[in-house]
Amino acid sequence: MVDRVSDDDFWSFKISEKSAGKECINLGSYNYLGFAESDGECTNKALEAVRQHGLAYCSPRQELGTSRIHQELESTVAEFLGVQDAITVGMGFATNTLNLPMIISKGCLVISDELNHASIILGLRLSGATVAVFKHNNVEHLEKVLRSNIVKGHPRSGRPWKKVFIVVEGVYSMEGSIVRLPEIIAIKKRYGAYLYLDEAHSVGAMGPRGRGIVDYYNLNPMDVDILMGTFTKSFGAAGGYIAGSSALIQYLRLRSQAFVYPSAMSAPVAQQVITSMKSIMYGKGILRVAQLARNSKYFRQRLQQMGFIIYGHDDSPVIPLLLFMPAKIRAFVLECLRHNVATVGVGFPATKMTEERARFCMSAGHTKEMIDEALDIIDRVGDYLNIKYSKRKLFHGKTIQY
């Protein structure tokens, strides 16, 4: 970590000249499975890809940018997810923002979770569709909003909607909550809607086989019409994918602005995803999935035992710690950093004004010694800043098993 300083009340930042950098326990990055490492099989294969294919293709996929490695990547993603086909693009944010307007258009109705990611919100705005929002992860309210809008029809003409979509995430990045997917699939089938599932924070990190939320609930992946995910979290790379039926993917290959116009994903990035994904399917990567689950549960339960208010699902690798007051975000992050623990503070507009928080992201690369050291520091910082707000300490007097 290096220190940043500001001379204009935090309108801009620069790296401090006195900062030499220091080693920290990283609790802020999305390196869920620890594949973003400087050595090992993934790194070696990525370096080999550079020697064979170079650093960049300097051409869009529809011109001269498609190579064998891209075809292998897309077939690997489809196999990993258990669907017919997949399309990959070079930027995770654009996977939502530029593909949603190609799938959803004017005259369509979208029922969207109120805490969906900014990339989804922007993509839906660009689509021109009518968007109705339901309370976070509340399937009863989802069905109420869906039924009401179907009955009313288009607000201007009263005519039936062209198509109806439900858009949700697998794991919500600020809440650590997990989508109630079985119930949403049941609603989708009942009303004849299409389901768009963003698995950016769940693919690789959730489920006994690391296949995401669909795997976590042991559901049929074909019950989800459009599967979206990114390679920037669990796979330690860049870019994202849309997966589903062959007809959908063939359509996107012809129409998607995220596929047609940008330069193709570089070979080492594509190879990083292939190697890490195949490691989960056929190698020792599955052990990382189990390690992440163990680390996440242990870290969450220890924080609850200390008296912190923790949001999210017990199985989620995203662990928000409530700070509530804006001033305590900076104090908490800097105090942790002073003791060599790097974390992320989150405030408005990413969260409500009254729900400021620190967000921890666990990794399979964390050892128990690292986690215990970080927990000891967080415990002391919590006492120092008086942020142990919970009125009941869970697991009081018990030994949390690792």
PLM features: residue spans?
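Conserved N-terminal alpha-helix of the aminotransferase class I/II PLP-enzyme fold
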Residues: 43-92
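N-terminal "arm"/small-domain region of PLP-dependent enzymes with the aminotransferase-like
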Residues: 1-55, 193
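Conserved PLP-anchoring active-site segment centered on the Schiff-base-forming lysine
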Residues: 99-118
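Conserved PLP-binding catalytic core of the aspartate aminotransferase-like
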Residues: 1-5, 286-300, 304-340, 348-350, ...
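Active-site phosphate-binding strand-loop segment of PLP-dependent enzymes
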Residues: 30, 132, 136-197
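Active-site C-terminal subdomain of aminotransferase-like
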Residues: 191-194, 201, 206-306, 311-315, ...
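Eukaryotic N-terminal low-complexity, Ser/Thr- and Lys/Arg-rich leader segments
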Residues: 1-12, 151-159, 384-402
